[in-house]
Design a protein with these regions (language model features):
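A Lys-centered signature of the CheY-like receiver
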Residues: 106
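Two-component/phosphorelay signaling modules centered on CheY-like receiver
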Residues: 6-25
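Receiver (REC) domain active-site loop signature in two-component systems and cognate sites
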Residues: 51
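Hydrophobic/aromatic residues positioned on beta-strands within the core alpha/beta folds
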Residues: 82-83
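Active-site residues of response regulator receiver
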Residues: 48
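Alpha4 helix (beta4-alpha4-beta5 surface) of REC/receiver domains from two-component response regulators
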Residues: 58, 74-75, 86-103, 111, ...
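Helix N-cap/capping motif at the beta->alpha junctions
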Residues: 26-35, 56
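Short amphipathic alpha-helix used as the core "switch/output" element in two-component signaling
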Residues: 35, 57-74
Length: 129
């Protein structure tokens, strides 16, 4: 699941679907991303570090708390954060948190995000293969 700015959502979704053999859900709002994460099982979460009302790290934390308290307990998938302020101390500190698998700085080449995704999700293949 990808949650970020609407224009970037469209570009990222199209690139992921075209490049990888995977299903991609997108969300224009963190509240909707939260609802999706409760309804479906995901192999990976990709959230913007800075979103309205709640940041990507807090959204990830909240999803994890809910997953720990539902029966049967669900394992939270790894998170890749996208950030326009990747050099900030808080963004760098988040990389040390359990489950945070990477940080991609904006602006970014889609290939950089694809590489991070492949490293996080075993079995994701290039569609060209």
């Amino acid at each position: 699941m990808v949650d970020d700015d609407v224009a970037l959502l469209r570009v990222v979704r199209e690139a992921l679907v075209a490049s990888l053999q995977c299903e991609v859900d997108t969300s224009p709002k963190p509240e909707y991303a939260f609802e999706l994460a409760l309804k479906k099982k995901y192999d990976l979460l990709v959230f913007d570090f800075q979103m309205p009302m709640i940041d990507g790290a807090m959204l990830f934390f909240l999803i994890g708390k809910v997953y720990q308290n539902i029966q049967p307990m669900r394992e939270i998938p790894p998170l890749i954060l996208i950030s326009g302020k990747a050099e900030e101390t808080r963004a760098q500190e988040l990389l040390k948190e359990p489950g945070v698998a990477g940080l991609v700085a904006k602006p970014f080449a889609i290939n950089r995000l694809l590489e991070k995704i492949k490293a996080c999700v075993p079995g994701v293949e290039d569609a060209a293969r």
